[in-house]
Amino acid sequence: LILPFNPRKASGFREGSLQMAPRVKLRLLEGTYGVARLSADASIPAWADGTGFLSISRTDDELSVVCRQERIPHDVKADTGWNCLKLQGPFAFDETGIVLSVIEPLSTNDIGIFVVSTFDGDHLLVKSKDLEKTFELLANAGHSCI
């Protein structure tokens, strides 16, 4: 099955309007984050819980934990040095183009990103070394960081 790609829908274009998806406010969360990888059969670690953003995902291949990096033990495989920006929602599940409008200016400028979605919103993680450039690119795209 091959589905046609509609770039107007993906970009947030609205029929009858030349407007793009709504501009998004993003809030920088305190702290620096890490993404830890555990074996697929690992128990959810107690060290993951605490202040700040936390996301735990399990697949057939792994258990991933996103949390403040100071909580990740040194003997756990992890990629650290991420900052977390929360897209100020909530956004409806059927609202299209929101995340794309934020990640497009970053990915086209070689900024590596990691997005985690929750029921009420989305969280964008960018490397700390790219944070200043991220703010600049998002502002140029019409978004605001608070």
Placement of each model-derived feature along the sequence:
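N-terminal amphipathic/basic-hydrophobic helices that include classical n-h-c signal peptides
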Residues: 1-19
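Generic hydrophobic-segment detector
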Residues: 2-4, 87, 124, 132
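A generic alpha-helix propensity feature with a strong bias for hydrophobic helices
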Residues: 7-10, 76, 108
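Regulatory modules associated with amino-acid/nitrogen control
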Residues: 16-105, 133-146
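A structural feature that tracks compact, well-ordered secondary-structure segments
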Residues: 90, 95-129
